[in-house]
């Protein structure tokens, strides 16, 4: 018996060695090193970082030329695209097609609260704190051309209204509306891959899936969403480092910024490794709970009347001028810095976010998806902007300069601290907001790490190696860019808009294919 045991142990050891060797050999396969999409997207990001290190001025000049060209020639197109996307989504939701159930499941995979938590936290990203604090005061200090100059009270309401336009219905609809309908049908009903290239299948057929066109489409989408995610990760390092310096005297240095980003990398990579139903869902849930607690606190001790009135009047003003604001074209320079910039940023997220929404929304109806993503989520977002940015405006109206002076020089990190400084227990509230900022970034980082991995591997459960690789890469690029000072992050911000040019054409066919698919599915499901 002992001889048999010895032989068995030797066989097990040999098999273990063989397995380890196979694993070592297959690491390249796990990372998809043979995938053209990996080399296309990875090479482009690498080239960007190398240029940023070796010749920042040349990179900035190239990016600025591309940015100006993109906003000048494609800005109007993007404005029309987002508006039509929102309107058609509402039409599908409110008509008989709204009853169509997507994802080949009779019931949703997760509860509505968990689902909405993930949706809200992923799509808001760090902008939910960065811009919620800074954008209203920016529009107050320098009035948007659509409204022009007015008395301080009116300027404050106009500032909220303009912020609501940028973070409201149109922005949310492009992130998970018509494109998700197309992807969910083609993936779950037609067994096509859950990749950006599938969005072009109704136009190009098999060429979109099997040719070089599909590789380019996937690579463009990955580069766009990586750039859009790297930016907030870098902002997180700048925000937390600045706050630690102001609150505790810790040096606001590259070392501090790097430590913050490394911590974020660890958090969102571990969350992505655990999957949608564990880490991503857990972080999102606690993120929402902390947000609700801060909302409740500010409503109790803050400028409650202005927050509520500002929200209602700002929303009313925005809805009343919805079409004119959405299609405003008179000041193209201002549009390039604000509306068109945001539209480019959100468009860049479009295909990959559609994949993520498709992954977590199985069993939901078109009406549930469209109303939740295009109506409910924007209303919640705008109320959050009223809580954070509205409080800042109220404090500014009461004591001119208390917020605007901190914002001088477009100092985004300083605005949040200036607002919390006016509240009871300012240090504690500032710390809670910084924690919230971090968890917002983590939910976006883990979701996009997961989604990029899905596209690279072609499976909804990508292996740990590829998830870890892309999680680390995005954080490493953020660290590399902030090491060069403001020039690196500024170049990336402008580059985000450039990536939206090809991505916007990937999303364009959804305007006519989503209604066609929804109508076809309504007939198949026996919906009169």
Where are these regions (language model features)?
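Membrane-water interface regions at transmembrane-helix termini and the short interhelical loops
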Residues: 25-30, 56-70, 89-109, 159-167, ...
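Membrane-interface alpha-helices at helix entry/exit sites of multi-pass transporters
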Residues: 76, 150-159, 208-219, 253-258, ...
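Helix-loop-helix module between adjacent transmembrane segments
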Residues: 10-13, 20, 24, 28-53, ...
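Membrane-embedded translocation segments of transport machinery
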Residues: 208-216, 221-364, 371, 376-430
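N-terminal alpha-helical transmembrane segments of multi-pass membrane transport
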Residues: 2-155, 296, 508-522, 526-528
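Flexible loop linkers connecting adjacent transmembrane helices
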Residues: 19-28, 61-67, 94-113, 137-161, ...
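Extracellular loop-to-transmembrane helix junctions
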Residues: 36-42, 68-85, 116, 157-188, ...
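Hydrophobic alpha-helical segments of multi-pass membrane transport proteins
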Residues: 44, 77-93, 291-302, 380-390, ...
